[in-house]
């Protein structure tokens, strides 16, 4: 399916509105085309009769035209109002589809793309698409009706002159097609550059505390200046192409007026055309050129819209790597044993991260992963909820292959507490309720109490309704961590992943958080990643991950006694 065919698919839900919009556009054009012809007919017939006949007939003609102009005004309102609403609805549909698609894309996509570019597609590109979606077909239809209609009348009045004008129009079309290709290339480049600017801006503002703490404002300004200048250079190329396009078309339009004047005068001199016909010709030339000017402006709009749509469609066409299998079902035994059978994993660059990993976690038991950074600990945890799919091997929960489990069911059964806590820019209550959007307020409070954060929340100005700031900037690291723990308490999953949940906290905060984590882990199958070995000594089993594989396994006491890597790490504390 071509890009154009994909684009027109979005008109289907609004087919009736779209068709009536075009009918109204046609009526608007036909009324404008009719007036010069009526005036020409009156000049050659009625106005040559006696005064009584003129005075008797004019009110009838005037009344008919008055009714036509009333209907034309109604049509203009419909086109201007409902047509724009249709465009806005299409923009909404595309934005919703794009956002839904973003939500379904796997982690690997986000590993390779930045937020600024994604925001540019959601906002700037879709606005241009919306403008083209409404104004494009409507203005194109009006313009074509006027151009074809006026040319027919020009041909009827003086066909020789019409043929000369047609030659100029064909030259104009050839010139426009050539310039269009240049314009589309510059518009696409322009969209990429504004995406880069948005990405740079988003990155700098999101990290403003780091920027200011290192006094690196000048570095960020320079990075932004480079991107901004690149955008300006792209705009210059864009406007040069547009300038050539518009100036060339203006020249051809001027040639039409000049040819009409010279050739029209020549045909009058030969007696092949009357002065009245030349006057009508001038009126129709105005009607003929006006839509050409609209088409010139419309070309720019359509090029912007189609450039935006190409970028939009480039994302929509990306298939998520992680999807439900055709026969996927809900998880049958969420409290069953978790087994990694000969699991291997590598990223797209084929760098091996895990190499033939085997281990089992009994239901309700805990396992801890330790080892150097980059050894694959976080990857092991990311494979369980299928943030990434394994390259080889098998992972089962309760004997059920996780690839045969619906993603929603799988992920609803797993709670994750991470080192880098993300809080949304809402209230404390909303952030805790993210673990279970259907929870009652009493259930939210109970989860907060279990996470040892309730008393602190009650000291806030608005309690649970207090705004936490973007990414929770108004809260300390320990406070954010306890809210994230409350969120998981509310979710109440049978499986728990603790990914270095206390590594970024001070000792006092760690002690408070560890109590909350111990309570959270009770009676749940738990996987813990930790650098601080003091937090995992009570784990039922500890795995030492190094060199993409399991080097050691056992309890804390067994590993200390063996004197291997774990004992070495422990004595370095």
Summary of predicted features, one role per range:
Residues 2, 11, 79, 83-87, ...:
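Juxtamembrane loop-to-helix connectors within ABC transporter transmembrane domains
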Residues 13, 17-27, 65-68, 135-189, ...:
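Transmembrane helices of ABC transporter permease
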Residues 16, 107-108, 124-133, 137, ...:
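An intracellular "coupling" helix at the cytosolic face of ABC transporter transmembrane type-1 domains
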Residues 18-75, 155-160, 271-275:
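Transmembrane helix-loop-helix hairpins at lipid-water interfaces of multipass membrane proteins
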Residues 22, 26-37, 66-77, 129-132, ...:
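Hydrophobic alpha-helical transmembrane bundles that constitute the permease/transmembrane domains
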Residues 48, 54, 63, 153-167, ...:
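Helix-loop-helix
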Residues 88, 96-126, 199-223, 227, ...:
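Short intracellular "coupling" helices and adjacent cytoplasmic loop segments at the cytosolic face
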Residues 324, 331-573:
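ABC-type nucleotide-binding domain
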